[in-house]
């Protein structure tokens, strides 16, 4: 075995392992070795390479890698194809910034073709950094053959899907109100909108709409979007709600009966009550009469009007509201559009022309006040949608879009979701299920440039539509020969014209590109160029057994995968979804570069190593919970887990090499109870870890492993050290080596999916082969000893209580004590005699015994709980307290047993004192200290005799010399001679314990003499001494 370099950094170790993986193609071998095995399928959600990875990506990649490695070691064939999401507005915006241009007009001036070329160049800006990050974190995924959404084969598969949807009559062109980003100048789909809501404070206005031909009657309408008022064409009421005409000062206001108090507040008189239907068709004067409307400015009925907020009357602007548009269409009213594609007012609103509408709320309100049409204004906090790409507030615009009729197969969506297992499970019928319940048709088209072109050609003459499902089909119907290397992007596909199969006219492609979420949602099919190639491979890799991404993908990739698959095949594309929570900063705030609280995962890997980062992300909390995260979290993972394991591994290799122990040879072994215990713990942990991993409970699995490693290090190895230090190779020493070897090799396999680098380092050195080509450990039931584990757990509890007891009384473990008494509070069949020596050695006591009668070592004190007793006993409270203090121990014990006592000396007669009135304190017998956990109480005799004190000094001396040996970097098995220069009293103490010193310090000769200032000095409490240490002859 190679010597373990304990000074090697985590990053150094990981770089060395990565080099070995690359040189020996371990990743490729891990897949090839499972050829012919059952497939386990997972899909890689494609990141964009025009932005750098963040800590959330580290979590996602860690989870996906863990699952893939575990399933591979469990016997499955797991293909891992990387992917890149390369289209969309983020790319366009980045290129615009790079070119110093802004908006569609300037893009077209620059030229579509050169702009598209720039987009292609920019999408892999950070590919090198992504590859390095992916490899450095240990995520095994095939980045040499990724699917790329901009490539022709991928787009052709997307076209096949869209062509099939069109063939089914589910893709249509419609006029409707859609969410629109004025900054990006394109519409968005409902699932995109759902990703960008923010809580904001906007100016709201209650507006006076003057009833036509009346002197002083007004409808009151309330709006949180005053900018839409210039486009008002109607007011809506609910026909079945009651409305009042109420006089306030010289005006009469019409408002919903249930809102009148909230709106008018005071000093009003209700004149009459009317059903909403009585108000229908009442005309009013437009508040902004700047553009003629032929049919409008009257009251209409709408079932979406409620009395929950506002005035019970809704201002209707059909160009900017979905409900508004629908009701105006059904009423046949006029349509008024006063905003351009940049979100700025047109000449229809002359005094605000060219201004961004969301900046004009104050201007609108001022205008209304000036015209005497403002009843009330106030700031209103509400949730408002913002663009998920550029963060601009969205507007709702009426216009033509291409839509997919998802609502037509809503039942399929819901049934497919019912078959999926969600982690966490509340997502299924909660956040995701409710989104499906309320979904609308998918707005698939985008009026942009860099994206998959929508493959619909329309006839100039007869409006016939043609949606080719392949390049070959497009070529077949093209009016002229198309290039062999036709690129499926704008402007190249726009140059292809098709002959109309219906009238023989010319067909041109509709100019839009598609929603990028449709691109990524098509990846199960398009990654293999299905159905044009790889049919068998596709069928083997569909559906996914699991997908895992951040919770923000609930209405993103999770939805688009489900939707595309349902529309195309009717089938569900995945069996399980792991919806990962956000990684937050220490204060629970979302990380962002602008706030300065973002952690760079690359920096964390460079500083602490990928194993530590992965472990920190996994052991902290379940991955679907939002987690507070910091550098300290990673540092703790490194020190408490990774470094602890490396120290155990280093210890084993060091002593095995010294003893020339070879695990492949056969030795006479005699397993101790400690060996049997650790093997049982190893296999019971294996059982729990496999169960947890099979149920995707990664944190539970990690915590089981962490507990095992801690016990191996701080209990098994520490309790076995003397066996490793013995000279020669007896049966018990061989058993210790054999046991620790099995423990380390098995742990390396258990942790391989979690911390792949340190796992590989251990397994490679101990077994000579890659752990990632090994099978995952299987429990050996014959080694399980639950009774032994329970007994050792009891011992560990007692030892922990003893240490806690010593800490509380400032008694170092090196200081021997006379006695430990164990009080058991629950009867069990624990054989404490078998563990006597362990407890005495661990807690450094000279005697140990178990006592069932705790009254021999403890007594109770009763104090009145004034918080509860004060109100109960009133003026008698002090008398009752005094009475409690003078009770005999027998009376106190009786109260503790029964929880009841009667005090009869009050003027009012007897008083009943119960358990809730009293604080019970357990007091140790004089000379003893006690610590309890409810199950056990540990009593320590704290009287330190002179003899015990001297032994404590000798043990402190041993500790100091052992530290000194470490500083000198002496081999652990080197026998030494020691010369000591110190005061006579310490000489006597050390001489009296010479055997103890020689046993623990590998001392051959121990003498006292005069040393010079050139020799080293040690501190032993207040005492200074000089020491000379040399190799023994």
From Swiss-Prot:
<feature type="short sequence motif" description="'HIGH' region">
    <location>
        <begin position="47"/>
        <end position="57"/>
    </location>
</feature>
<protein>
    <recommendedName>
        <fullName>Isoleucine--tRNA ligase 2</fullName>
        <ecNumber>6.1.1.5</ecNumber>
    </recommendedName>
</protein>
<dbReference type="GO" id="GO:0005737">
    <property type="term" value="C:cytoplasm"/>
</dbReference>
<dbReference type="GO" id="GO:0000049">
    <property type="term" value="F:tRNA binding"/>
</dbReference>
<comment type="similarity">
    <text>Belongs to the class-I aminoacyl-tRNA synthetase family. IleS type 2 subfamily.</text>
</comment>
<comment type="subunit">
    <text>Monomer.</text>
</comment>
<dbReference type="GO" id="GO:0002161">
    <property type="term" value="F:aminoacyl-tRNA deacylase activity"/>
</dbReference>
<keyword id="KW-0547">Nucleotide-binding</keyword>
<dbReference type="InterPro" id="IPR002301">
    <property type="entry name" value="Ile-tRNA-ligase"/>
</dbReference>
<dbReference type="GO" id="GO:0005524">
    <property type="term" value="F:ATP binding"/>
</dbReference>
<dbReference type="Pfam" id="PF08264">
    <property type="entry name" value="Anticodon_1"/>
</dbReference>
<dbReference type="Pfam" id="PF19302">
    <property type="entry name" value="DUF5915"/>
</dbReference>
<dbReference type="InterPro" id="IPR014729">
    <property type="entry name" value="Rossmann-like_a/b/a_fold"/>
</dbReference>
<keyword id="KW-0648">Protein biosynthesis</keyword>
<feature type="short sequence motif" description="'KMSKS' region">
    <location>
        <begin position="590"/>
        <end position="594"/>
    </location>
</feature>
<keyword id="KW-0436">Ligase</keyword>
<dbReference type="Pfam" id="PF00133">
    <property type="entry name" value="tRNA-synt_1"/>
</dbReference>
<keyword id="KW-0030">Aminoacyl-tRNA synthetase</keyword>
<keyword id="KW-0963">Cytoplasm</keyword>
<keyword id="KW-0067">ATP-binding</keyword>
<dbReference type="GO" id="GO:0006428">
    <property type="term" value="P:isoleucyl-tRNA aminoacylation"/>
</dbReference>
<dbReference type="InterPro" id="IPR009080">
    <property type="entry name" value="tRNAsynth_Ia_anticodon-bd"/>
</dbReference>
<dbReference type="InterPro" id="IPR002300">
    <property type="entry name" value="aa-tRNA-synth_Ia"/>
</dbReference>
<dbReference type="InterPro" id="IPR023586">
    <property type="entry name" value="Ile-tRNA-ligase_type2"/>
</dbReference>
<dbReference type="GO" id="GO:0008270">
    <property type="term" value="F:zinc ion binding"/>
</dbReference>
<dbReference type="InterPro" id="IPR009008">
    <property type="entry name" value="Val/Leu/Ile-tRNA-synth_edit"/>
</dbReference>
<dbReference type="InterPro" id="IPR033709">
    <property type="entry name" value="Anticodon_Ile_ABEc"/>
</dbReference>
<dbReference type="InterPro" id="IPR013155">
    <property type="entry name" value="M/V/L/I-tRNA-synth_anticd-bd"/>
</dbReference>
<keyword id="KW-0479">Metal-binding</keyword>
<dbReference type="InterPro" id="IPR001412">
    <property type="entry name" value="aa-tRNA-synth_I_CS"/>
</dbReference>
<comment type="function">
    <text>Catalyzes the attachment of isoleucine to tRNA(Ile). As IleRS can inadvertently accommodate and process structurally similar amino acids such as valine, to avoid such errors it has two additional distinct tRNA(Ile)-dependent editing activities. One activity is designated as 'pretransfer' editing and involves the hydrolysis of activated Val-AMP. The other activity is designated 'posttransfer' editing and involves deacylation of mischarged Val-tRNA(Ile).</text>
</comment>
<dbReference type="GO" id="GO:0004822">
    <property type="term" value="F:isoleucine-tRNA ligase activity"/>
</dbReference>
<feature type="binding site">
    <location>
        <position position="593"/>
    </location>
    <ligand>
        <name>ATP</name>
    </ligand>
</feature>
<keyword id="KW-0862">Zinc</keyword>
